[in-house]
Amino acid sequence: MRVSILAAATAALAAAPACAAEHVVLMENIAYAPTELRAKVGDTIRFVNADGTNHAVFVATRGHGVDLGMQKPKAETVLTLGKEGRFEVECVNHPNMRLVVVVTK
Amino acid sequence: MSRLSLGLAAATAIGSIAAGIAFAGPERVKYPEKFRQDFVMFNTVDRPDLKAVRLVFINKAADAEAKAGQPLPEGSILIVEQRKAKLDDKGEPLRDAAGRLIPTDEIMTILAMEKRKGWGEAYPADKRNGDWEYNVFKPDRTPNVAVKMDGCFSCHLNRADRDFTFTYFKNRQDRGN
């Protein structure tokens, strides 16, 4: 019986997904902070607009393309990282705002 | 040259300039009749806020001529076909195994930009997007005349260093050829 309980617990642990992390990126002084980020598949990035102007989360990198729309001051958006790869986040309004994201398994 | 011929030449020149200015506008960009045959899809952009997926196309002739890091060739046409995303029973977008939205066949709107030599000359410097012109079409491919193109010009002006494109120029740079 002990063996079967242990086996069941081990199987359950093995099946459980690894804890996803949330990474916070500030949009401040017309820049993302940080400007580089490493994350795992399943993690999320929370973008917080701390500026007094609109910003955006736009990715043109092929295979990762996404546009979360215009983000007003104090607003937050969340990007879920669903696949591996390297991509660049940019602000539609401010061409020099760039964030490089590297996602691994 | 006689006064008469000088006058005629001046009138012709003024007429040409006036015609160029008068015809500047979205109506210069037509929906490509052979879109399905003549274009290639090079990117997709999820729009979760709109519950939509944007499929991005370029005409094959321009794609063949384009080079990484160079302005797009004259005659380039970029099309964004915005389609409704597949939704779950709660009305939220479904995602595939890679976390991407799944486009349906239902077209919401079609955005187009086309580059022709001299098209930008009619616009002031603070608006001009090189020689690009914009238009928006309804799902039935007729122009959506309710849409003002000022937003297109002002937004794309932020990517002057990429020949005013958000995706294609960067995608070629990323590809390296």
Predicted segment positions?
Chain A
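Bacterial N-terminal signal peptides that target proteins for export
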Residues: 1-6
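Extracytoplasmic copper-binding redox domains, predominantly the cupredoxin/blue-copper superfamily
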Residues: 10, 15, 19-105
